[in-house]
């Protein structure tokens, strides 16, 4: 029940609220969601359960996360939800996936990387494929109350044994 985890749960709740609002505005049958760095797809399974007609594509760089997510898909017999394994910071990635989303999710990734050009590549790539009536839903953790603790306790997401560092964006 540490304050940081409380914030993560609130962020998930707020993210789901925004996604559901956009789904309801577009009409469930017409929704195509892309998560640019979706991890295991955790919260998107909540969306899929509530809105089974929504099409979801989750891009994730870590194959172990994809394996976990694909197990959930298989176990629950979910349709129209899948993973791809591309570099979310490569602008060309978004052309390669051949997908025109009307909801793009960028959540919990930008604060982990220091190179602003990488982030610009993501945004530019997404902007090129986003449906004209689409929306980008972005979340960050600019005022996370436990940034120092995270840096000292968690392993790096990059696998290089450096301290975890979150940037305020």
Where are the model-predicted features located?
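Conserved SAM/SAH-binding beta-strand->alpha-helix loop
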Residues: 62-64
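Conserved beta-strand signature within the Rossmann-like core of class I S-adenosyl-L-methionine
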Residues: 133-140
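A conserved beta-strand element that flanks and buttresses the S-adenosyl-L-methionine
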Residues: 105
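Conserved SAM-binding loop
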Residues: 69-70
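A short glycine-rich, Lys/Arg-flanked "PGG" loop and its adjoining helix->strand segment in the class I
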Residues: 120-132
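Conserved SAM-binding loop of SAM-dependent methyltransferases across substrates and taxa
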Residues: 40-52
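Conserved Class I S-adenosyl-L-methionine-dependent methyltransferase catalytic core
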Residues: 1-26
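Conserved Class I S-adenosyl-L-methionine
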Residues: 149-169
